[in-house]
Swiss-Prot record:
CC annotations in GO: membrane
Compartmental location: Membrane
InterPro entries: ST7
Membrane-topology descriptor: Multi-pass membrane protein
Gene encoding the protein: ST7
Keywords, ordered alphabetically: Membrane, Transmembrane, Transmembrane helix
Protein's UniProt name: Suppressor of tumorigenicity 7 protein homolog
Organism: Gallus gallus (Chicken)
Length: 554
C-alpha cells in the first residue's frame, strides 16, 4: 500500500514538473494573443508608425555607425574567446552557459540515477581518472650528471621540469629509505639528502655519508648526479654494487626477525635491483650490448616479482639493437598479455616485428590494386593497435616533430611516453627496410576507426582526457606538447568571427552605397514579416468581426 502511494506521488510530481516545463510555451502564445487583441487600446499601430517614421528620418551615417559598433563589439568578444580557448581549452560562453545558465533554466536530467548510484559512478570515474593519469618511472631514463647536465651546459636549457624532478625525489625516498635509517648515521644523512632540493647539497651529503661508511645509496647519488661521463657512472655503480650486496646478504638473514628487519630487507632489495639495472644500462650505452642483455636476463630471473622497474623494456631495446628478433618475439609473448599493463614499447615493438615481415616488399600502389595479403593485414592491424594506444609516436618516428631528451617520468598514452619511446627506438625502425614507409602509409587510418576517441575506443579504453595537462607538467616549456584529439574551435568563436565579419561588411557597404543598402534593408524586413502578416490576415478572416469588436472594447 505504501509502495502504491509512493508511486502515485512520484507520478504526480513528474506530471507537475512536465507541465511546468512546457507551461512557458502556452504563456508565450497567450501573451502574443493579448497583445494582438489590445493593439487598439495600447495604440500599438500608432507607436509602430512613429517608430517607422523615426527610422525613415535616420541618415546612412547612423547605420554605418551602428554596424561599425556591432563589428567592434563582436571583434572584442572574438579576441577574448580566442584567448580564453588558447589558455583553458574551452569556450568562455559555453562554460558560463553550461555551468550557470543551464541549472537556472531547468536543465536537469529527470532520468538521473539515485544518489547512491551517482556516488558509486563518481567514485568509479574518479578511480579510472586516477589510473589513467598515473605517472610512471621512465625505464630508459637518462643519467642527470652524464647526460641531462651536459645538455644544459651546451644549450643553456633545462631538460627536466621541477615537477618531474620532484617525482624522482619521491621515488628515491620510497626505494632507498626505510624506518630504521636513523639507527645508522650514513643512512640517516642520505635520508635527508634525498629530500634536499639543491643538487650540490645532495652531492655534499653523499660525500659526507661515504666518509662514515661504505653507503650504497651515496654511491648511487654520485653516479647519477656527479659523474659527468657514463664510464665514471659505471665505476661508481660498481662500488655501490659491492656495498649493496653486503647489506642485502645481511638483511636477508634477518628479514624474518620482525617488521623493521623485513622493511630494511625490502629497501636493500630495491637498492640492489636499481644498481644492477643501471649497470646494465651503462653497459648498453658503452656498446657492450650482449653483456647488458645477460645482466638484464639474470636480474629478471633473480627478482621476477619486481615488475615495477619494467626491466623487460630495457631488455627489448637491447635485443632490438642486437637484431635478435626471435628473442624479442619471445619477450613480447610473455609481456604482451591482456592482463598486463600495456606500453608504447610493447605495442610498437609488436608492430615493428609484424611490419618487418612485409615492409621490404610493401607498395601502396600494388596494395590498392590487388588488396592486402594476410601478412600485410596483420602488420596494418598491429600498427593501428599501436597508434590507438599512443597516437603521438608516429609523428616522432616519421620525424614530423623534433625530439627532445625524454623526461624521467612518463604518462602512458601521452606525449611524454611517445618522446621516451621514439628517442631510443627510432634507430630500430630505420634499420628495418620499409618499416617507416609502411607506418607512413597506414597510421592515419587508425583515426577513421575511432572517430570519437574520448568517448569510445576500439581495442583499448577511450583515450584519457588528462594527458595534455600532465604532459605539460612533465615536459619542458620549450617543447610544444602534442595534443590528441585535435581540439576543434568552439561554436561561439566561429559565430563571433562570422558576426564580426558580417557586420563589418555591412558597415562598409552602407558607407559606400547608402541608397542601395536602404532599399535592400526595406526589402529584407518586408520579406521577414510577410509570413506573420499572412497568418494574421488568415486569423482575421476566420474569426467573426463582432468578436474582434467585443474583445477590443474590453
Amino acid at each position: 500500500m505504501a509502495e502504491a502511494g509512493t508511486g502515485f506521488l512520484e507520478q504526480l510530481k513528474s506530471c507537475i514538473v512536465w507541465s511546468w516545463t512546457y507551461l512557458w510555451t502556452l504563456w508565450f502564445f497567450i501573451m502574443l494573443f493579448l497583445v494582438y487583441i489590445l493593439r487598439v487600446p495600447l495604440k500599438i499601430n500608432d507607436n509602430l508608425t512613429t517608430v517607422s517614421m523615426f527610422l525613415n528620418t535616420l541618415t546612412p551615417k547612423f547605420y554605418v555607425a551602428l554596424t561599425g559598433t556591432s563589428s567592434l563589439i563582436s571583434g572584442l568578444i572574438l579576441i577574448f574567446e580566442w584567448w580564453y580557448f588558447r589558455k583553458y581549452g574551452t569556450s568562455f560562453i559555453e562554460q558560463v552557459s553550461v555551468s550557470h545558465l543551464r541549472p537556472l533554466l531547468g536543465g536537469v536530467d529527470n532520468s538521473a540515477p539515485s544518489a547512491a548510484n551517482a556516488a558509486n559512478g563518481e567514485a568509479d570515474s574518479s578511480r579510472q581518472s586516477v589510473s589513467e593519469c598515473k605517472v610512471w618511472r621512465n625505464p630508459l631514463n637518462l643519467f642527470r650528471g652524464a647526460e641531462y647536465n651536459r645538455y644544459t651546459w651546451v644549450t643553456g636549457r633545462e631538460p627536466l621540469t621541477y615537477y618531474d624532478m620532484n617525482l624522482s625525489a619521491q621515488d628515491h625516498q620510497t626505494f632507498f629509505t626505510c624506518d630504521t635509517d636513523h639507527l645508522r648515521p650514513a643512512d640517516a644523512i642520505m635520508q635527508k639528502a634525498w629530500r634536499e632540493r639543491n643538487p650540490q647539497a645532495r652531492i655534499s651529503a653523499a660525500h659526507e655519508a661515504l666518509e662514515l661508511n661504505e653507503c650504497a645509496t651515496a654511491y648511487i647519488l654520485l653516479a647519477e648526479e656527479e659523474a659527468t661521463t657514463i664510464v665514471e657512472a659505471e665505476k661508481l655503480f660498481k662500488q655501490a654494487l659491492k656495498a649493496g650486496e653486503g647489506c642485502y646478504r645481511r638483511s636477508q638473514q634477518l628479514q624474518h626477525h620482525g617488521a623493521q628487519y623485513e622493511a630494511q630487507h625490502r629497501r636493500d632489495t630495491n637498492v640492489l635491483v636499481y644498481i644492477k639495472r643501471r649497470l646494465a644500462m651503462c653497459a648498453r650505452k658503452l656498446g657492450r650490448t650482449r653483456e647488458a642483455v645477460k645482466m638484464m636476463r639474470d636480474l629478471m630471473k633473480e627478482f621476477p616479482l619486481l615488475s615495477m622497474f619494467n626491466i623487460h623494456e630495457n631488455l627489448l631495446e637491447a635485443l632490438l639493437e642486437l637484431q635478435a628478433y626471435a628473442d624479442v618475439q619471445a619477450v613480447l609473448a610473455k609481456y604482451d598479455d591482456i592482463s598486463l599493463p600495456k606500453s608504447a614499447t610493447i605495442c610498437y615493438t609488436a608492430a615493428l616485428l609484424k611490419a618487418r615481415a612485409v615492409s621490404d616488399k610493401f607498395s601502396p600502389e600494388a596494395a590498392s590494386r590487388r588488396g592486402l595479403s594476410t601478412a600485410e593485414m596483420n602488420a596494418v592491424e598491429a600498427i593501428h593497435r599501436a597508434v590507438e594506444f599512443n597516437p603521438h609516436v608516429p609523428k616522432y618516428l616519421l620525424e614530423m616533430k623534433s625530439l627532445i631528451l625524454p623526461p624521467e617520468h612518463i604518462l602512458k598514452r601521452g606525449d611524454s611516453e611517445a618522446i621516451a619511446y621514439a628517442f631510443f627506438h627510432l634507430q630500430h625502425w630505420k634499420r628495418v627496410e620499409g618499416a617507416l614507409n609502411l607506418l607512413h602509409c597506414t597510421w592515419e587510418g587508425t583515426f577513421r576507426m575511432i572517430p570519437y576517441p574520448l568517448e569510445k575506443g576500439h581495442l583499448f579504453y577511450p583515450y584519457p582526457i588528462c594527458t595534455e595537462t600532465a604532459d605539460r607538467e612533465l615536459l619542458p616549456s620549450f617543447h610544444e606538447v602534442s595534443v590528441y584529439p585535435k581540439k576543434e574551435l568552439p561554436f561561439f568563436i566561429l559565430f563571433t568571427a562570422g558576426l564580426c565579419s558580417f557586420t563589418a561588411m555591412l558597415a562598409l557597404l552602407t558607407h559606400q552605397f547608402p541608397e542601395l543598402m536602404g532599399v535592400f534593408a526595406k526589402a529584407f524586413l518586408s520579406t521577414l514579416f510577410a509570413p506573420l502578416n499572412f497568418v494574421m490576415e488568415k486569423v482575421e478572416s476566420i474569426l467573426p468581426s463582432s468578436l474582434w469588436h467585443q474583445l477590443t472594447r474590453i
